[in-house]
Every structure is written in C-alpha cells, then in structure tokens.
A protein has these predicted regions:
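Short, conserved turn/kink motifs that form compact alpha/beta structural patches or helix kinks used as
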Residues: 2-17, 28, 37-40, 47-156
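Short, Lys/Arg-enriched N-terminal segments with co-localized hydrophobic residues
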Residues: 21-22
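Short, solvent-exposed beta-strand/turn "edge" segments of beta-rich domains on protein surfaces
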Residues: 33-35
Length: 156
C-alpha cells in the first residue's frame, strides 16, 4: 500500500475539517504527509463497528498508516481516580500513543478519519495480525494523535 499524494490544502472537505477543529490547513496537511511518509509508520487497515449492532460485522474503512510514538502517558495532573476511570480495569501497559492517517487522498470517496471505537489492524514484524482499539483521539496541527488499546487476545 502506498499513501496517496494529496498536497492541496484548499480542498473544500479539508478546509471544513480544519476549520471545525480550528487548525491551520497547511500545517495540518504537512503533519499528515509527514506521518504518511514516515519510515517507521506501519501500514494498517481500519474497521468501524456498527453502533447499533455490536454483533454485526465491522465496516472496513480502508487503508491507513499508523506511527506509534510510545506508551501512553496520562497527564501528570490526573489523580488516581481519573487514571482508574481512563484505563477502566485494563492494563495501562496496553495503551499506546500513535498518529493515524488515512492513506486515501483528502477529498476522495475513500478518505476517512479515525474515530474513538474504531479497530486498527496491523502486522507485527513476525507476520501476525495485531489489533488495537482507538480509545481516545485528539487532532492538532501535529496530526491525529490517538490512544490505542492493544488487544492482547490472539485472533486464532
């Protein structure tokens, strides 16, 4: 998979998304391109569960690139109760910070943005499928930074 080239910061959809998040479209696009081109970014596929039927098959959103930047570190001003609520009985070691960018060009029908609840499937170095869940995300001019919760259950 190779990311699509999209260097038009004036695309109407891009301008609308950046305006809604109060972001500079050019800076945000540069950050997006940096993630897509980063040598350590991994190819992945995103899936979105059906909000109305959790037993239904997830919708395949498409290809993306994920750039893991490290273990998730909760803000230093969080108290113990906030940390417990955020991790919700999950092992904090399973939470990672990562930038996620859709491989499709902005403005195309294939373009999407990762959202809380999406599933991220990537391949490990040994060829195993690794699943993560988008637990949280925030968009800034540095990109779409997501907190991913690794699914530690084997797929097969």
């Amino acid at each position: 998979m190779s990311p699509q080239e999209d260097s038009n910061p004036h695309d109407p959809l891009w301008l609308q998304m950046c305006a809604a998040a109060d972001l500079d479209p050019l800076r945000r696009l540069q950050a997006r391109q940096a993630v897509l081109r980063h040598p350590q970014a991994q190819d992945c596929t995103l899936y979105r569960p059906d909000e109305d039927d959790y037993e239904a098959e997830e919708e395949e959103l498409g290809d993306a690139r994920v750039l893991f930047v490290g273990a998730f570190e909760p803000p230093s001003d969080w108290d113990e109760a906030e940390r417990l609520a955020y991790f919700d009985d999950c092992d904090p070691a399973l939470f990672f910070s990562a930038y996620v960018e859709c491989a499709a060009a902005v403005g195309t029908a294939a373009f999407f943005m990762a959202e809380i609840g999406d599933h991220v499937a990537s391949m490990t170095a040994d060829g195993q499928v690794q699943m993560h869940f988008v637990h949280d995300c925030s968009e800034s001019e540095q990109g779409l930074l997501c907190v991913l919760l690794r699914d530690d259950q084997p797929l097969f």
